[in-house]
Design a protein with these regions (language model features):
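A conserved helix-loop-strand patch within extracytoplasmic ligand-binding domains
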Residues: 118-192
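Positively charged n-region of N-terminal signal peptides that target proteins for export
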Residues: 6-7, 13-18
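Extracellular/periplasmic juxtamembrane helices and adjacent flexible linkers that interface
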Residues: 276-356
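C-terminal motif of bacterial Sec signal peptides marking the signal peptidase cleavage site
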Residues: 29-33
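Early extracytoplasmic/lumenal segment of secretory-pathway proteins
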Residues: 34-120, 130-132, 238
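Stable alpha-helical elements in mature extracytoplasmic
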Residues: 57-61, 65, 93, 110-113, ...
């Protein structure tokens, strides 16, 4: 074989090796980028990144809490932890996790949304509610009204929301967990007022949603429509969101009205087991949720206007939280699975009463 042929083939073999090496480098870089984007534990164990997929109005709560947990975890383990947040309507967020969003933990508006992840994607153990105290709900809230200063439309209870001259703002129960709590609180009032008369209850709900000016996809969007876009006479809102609005905009612009009856809202939390196992973040993810029950975690919840589970912390902040008569989903609606099927699934009661 001529020398120039041997040299050419040698060059070709060298080029193939070089190309293969470059492909490996690119693959390694792509894998590294994917891990960085979704969060993971570093190979040396010195850093960990978590993704908390949460519902709409918890932004301020977890911004403060994440800083406290990072300090606690660093002191306890020597490991640096950063927590990325994703926020949106609770139902929409649950679907994102089901569709592949690599959450290490979920902190959603209601148990049904976490059950959906467990059942449809099998990413969470079925017994998730039993793993932490109070069925994995570290804080509670309820549903109230936010009106403009002076309450010009004289809104004092649910009955005032069906008056023809009242414009209501509430999110869409198809995408928002808070909206489902709002709807069920209104239904509980109608059920008590009309003595379980299903026809009258449905007419009340139809009249109420007939007054709704816009259905935003999440609670924070509804708050923005009411406070910044000037839409509506009344916002049906999470209690914590209403108080946060007063803190941000001032009591000279808005005021809170507590209805005669509301609902005990219990937003739950869970580790996304298979994702955390895959990413090597399980230990930090479990600690992240457990720390919510610590004195520090409970105080941060209370400061952000969530009702803490810890009795001592609740007593410290009791003046902040007025006593409101509430029903529970379990007793009034037979649990979230039944409530979802009856009211919010396609073809359910909400679809029949909302005609816009």
């Amino acid at each position: 074989m001529p020398f120039f042929m041997r040299k050419k083939r040698g060059e070709i073999r060298h080029m193939k090796k070089t190309a293969a090496f470059l492909v490996l480098i690119l693959l390694a870089g792509a894998l590294s980028a994917c891990q960085s984007e979704s969060g993971s534990a570093s190979s040396d164990g010195k850093t960990v990144q978590l993704l908390n997929v949460s519902y709409d109005p918890t932004r301020e709560l977890y911004k403060e809490y994440n800083q406290a947990f990072s300090s606690y975890w660093k002191k306890k383990t020597g490991q640096d932890v950063t927590v990325q947040q994703s926020h949106g309507g609770s139902g929409k967020q649950a679907r994102s996790v089901i569709d592949g969003l690599d959450a290490d933990v979920v902190t959603l508006a209601l148990g049904y949304d976490i059950d959906s992840i467990a059942e449809k994607a099998r990413l969470i153990d079925q017994n998730w509610q039993s793993r932490l105290p109070d069925q994995s709900t570290p804080y509670t809230s309820t549903i109230v009204f936010l009106v403009r200063k002076g309450n010009p439309k004289h809104i004092n209870d649910w009955a005032d929301l069906v008056k023809k001259d009242v414009s209501v703002i509430t999110p869409n129960p198809k995408t928002s967990g808070g909206a489902r709590w709002n709807y069920l609180a209104a239904w509980a009032y109608a059920d008590e007022t009309y003595h379980h008369d299903d026809t009258k209850i449905k007419q009340f709900m139809k009249d109420l949603y007939g007054n709704v000016e816009v259905l935003d996809s999440g609670a924070r969007g509804a708050t923005t429509s009411f406070t910044e876009r000037g839409m509506g006479d009344v916002l049906i809102a999470w209690e914590n969101e209403a108080y946060l609005t007063l803190k941000e905009f001032g009591k000279e612009k808005f005021e809170i009205i507590n209805p005669s009856i509301s609902i005990l809202a219990e937003p739950p939390v869970s580790v996304v087991d298979k994702t955390a196992d895959k990413k090597g973040t399980k230990k930090a993810a479990e600690a992240y949720l457990s720390y919510l029950y610590s004195k520090k975690g409970q105080e941060i919840a209370a400061k952000n206007f969530y009702r803490p589970r810890d009795k001592e912390v609740l007593k410290t902040y009791e003046k902040q939280f007025p006593k409101i008569k509430t029903v529970t989903v379990e007793k009034e609606f037979g649990g979230w699975k039944k409530a979802q099927e009856t009211h919010f699934n396609d073809g359910g009661t909400f679809d029949s009463i909302y005609e816009k």
